[in-house]
Amino acid sequence: MLRIMVVSGLLLAVVMGLAAQPAFAETPDEVLASFKKEAAGTPGFQGFSATRGENFYKTRHGSDWSCSSCHTDNPAAQGKHAKSDKVIKPLAPSANSERFTDIKKVEKWFKRNCNDVLDRVCTVQEKGDFLTYVLTIKK
């Protein structure tokens, strides 16, 4: 009986430990790899560029905003929303380890922010270039 209780207790501890972990935690490199896989089917795709990503990040697009309007010129710095003044944690994974670790959140924020900045969704090329750039930023 004691043996059953010990085994049951250990099993419960393992299950609870697994439940506490994020279900699909990715690394930023894995998110980038998923963009690359998606982009591979695009005619003319030749890879992502940190230079294009930096230009995309800092350029004002269709509206008066750029990514840096809220996230600052330094993605490793804390930002502030241009309209609401809400504080935004650093964008660069080197300064904020939670960034780009959940593909669903990544896609949600790209959808929202691209619509705000570009008045359209971002292409996979733009997302890949952007992430390639942000991954070059050191704290």
Predicted segments — roles?
Residues 79-86:
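Short cysteine/histidine-rich zinc-coordinating motifs and their immediately flanking basic loops
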Residues 86-92:
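TPR/TPR-like alpha-solenoid helical repeat scaffolds
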Residues 27, 68, 82:
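Short acidic alpha-helical/loop segments enriched in Asp/Glu that coordinate divalent cations
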Residues 2-50, 94-139:
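Post-cleavage N-terminal segment of exported redox proteins
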Residues 61, 75, 135-139:
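Short alpha-helix boundary/capping elements
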Residues 63-75, 130:
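The canonical Cys-X-X-Cys-His
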Residues 54-65:
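Local sequence-structure signature of Cys/Sec-based thiol-disulfide redox active-site neighborhoods
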